[in-house]
Amino acid sequence: LSACNETKSVTNFAWTVSDERASAELKDFCHNLTSRLEAGIMLGHKDALAYGSMWYNQPGRSDVKSVCGNYPAVVDWDLGGIESGSELNVDSIPFFRIRQYVEQVYRRNGVTILSWNPSLSSLLRKDSLQNVVRSVLSGNESRVEYEQYLDRVAVFLETLKNSDGRHIPVIVHLFHSPNLASMDWGMGHCSPEDYVRLWRMTVDYLRNKKNIHHVLYAYSMYGIVSEEEISQYYPGDKYVDIVGLNLYQDFESDESGSLYKQRLNMGLSAISRFAEANKKLPALTDTGSKGVKISNFFSSI
């Protein structure tokens, strides 16, 4: 099953769920994802049901559906803001509405991704000489506050249920692009070792303390071209289900998109090899182009 009648062939990867206590629903979800790999590529769109080109909060509407007749197979929502107790996420979408959208996507046999990349800098005391990740890992007040963040995330995940009261399986995309300096957990702010510790601590807390077992975890890197780069921050097979590439067509001198396409092919090849070797699901987790720079971006690039 794929969106927009996309039928490109994809290698069949044998992969295993990282959570040893995965719910029955999550195991079924994984089986469905595996079968879809054989069918083609699932196209995704962020905030697809909430707003689009010249519209906002119109039930049943989607830009992707308007273009090709089908809803996107994958819909991504940002959980940013939930850690502070906000009723709105960072894109000003109410969390109660995101919960409704997740259920709608589930009923259509689609896939939901929940991206969570919290601002950790607010956890750091002004007089602290540590970086924020090291502060969270050290077990002081920052750790306590961070666990409160996770408590709020867990409450939201717990409420994601279908009409039968069963948990809806979702993908949580954590701490993306650690090889970028712009992230609190990124290069220059956090060592690869501390990044791995933060990731594992986060997943362990959600699984073991909050009993969350209907989630797959996605790990992603920006613009990589080799398996060695992926390995540098990789949290380990027991903590990751999906290995992804993030890459935007953001090159001022790349008007044709040829450089983007070259880097995309190299990155996806590396991701696919790494995923196959580690029995994980490969994905292009984040991509796009700001504005309509290339008219055939989706059809040819």
Predicted segments with their positions:
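C-terminal motif of bacterial Sec signal peptides marking the signal peptidase cleavage site
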Residues: 2-3
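N-terminal module-boundary/linker segments of secreted carbohydrate-active enzymes
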Residues: 7-76, 80, 89-92
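Alpha-helical scaffolding within the catalytic cores
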Residues: 28, 55-64, 96-100, 155-156, ...
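Acidic (Asp/Glu)-rich catalytic clusters
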Residues: 34, 62-70, 99-109, 157-167, ...
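Aromatic-lined carbohydrate-recognition surfaces of secreted/lumenal glycan-active proteins
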Residues: 43-46, 169-176, 199-229, 279-292
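Conserved, mostly hydrophobic/aromatic
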Residues: 75, 172, 241-243
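Substrate-binding cleft of extracellular glycoside hydrolase catalytic domains
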Residues: 80, 84-208, 212
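Glycoside hydrolase catalytic-domain groove-lining segments
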Residues: 108, 227, 231-290
